[in-house]
């Protein structure tokens, strides 16, 4: 009888371990990241809601933007062409549209029909420093 309890206990531990690994795998693969080819980026066009602000051609500034964008992960899907806000910045990176904005004292990067990424204030300020 005790032999059966030992087998049941080991089986329960094995099932728990398998479920934990499966859960971690599903969690890590369900996050969205921005898909782009950083090596191909020669220029980033920056727009406000109303007009074009500037072109970013500096490799250092482009690298700074790319470093921030490559870190982003999200589970929140974007279902809009652009943010429904009065103030935002639009970055045109090759064929990719990226929006940067603040809403309710939180900071976001949004890629239309892909994802909405929550960023921290220092990332937001760094992006604004580059795009303004």
For the regions a language model picked out, list residue spans one by one.
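Function-determining sites in protein domains
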Residues: 2-132
């Amino acid at each position: 009888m005790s032999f059966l309890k030992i087998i049941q206990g080991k089986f329960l531990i094995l099932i728990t371990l398998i479920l934990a690994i499966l859960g971690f795998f599903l969690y890590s693969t369900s996050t969205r990241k921005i898909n782009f080819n950083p090596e191909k980026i020669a220029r980033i066009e920056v727009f406000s809601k109303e007009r074009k602000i500037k072109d970013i051609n500096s490799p250092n500034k482009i690298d700074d933007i790319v470093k921030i964008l490559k870190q982003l992960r999200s589970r929140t899907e974007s279902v809009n062409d652009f943010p429904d806000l009065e103030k935002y910045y639009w970055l045109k990176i090759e064929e990719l549209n990226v929006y940067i904005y603040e809403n309710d004292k939180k900071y976001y990067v949004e890629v239309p029909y892909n994802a909405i990424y929550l960023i921290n204030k220092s990332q937001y300020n760094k992006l604004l420093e580059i795009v303004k």
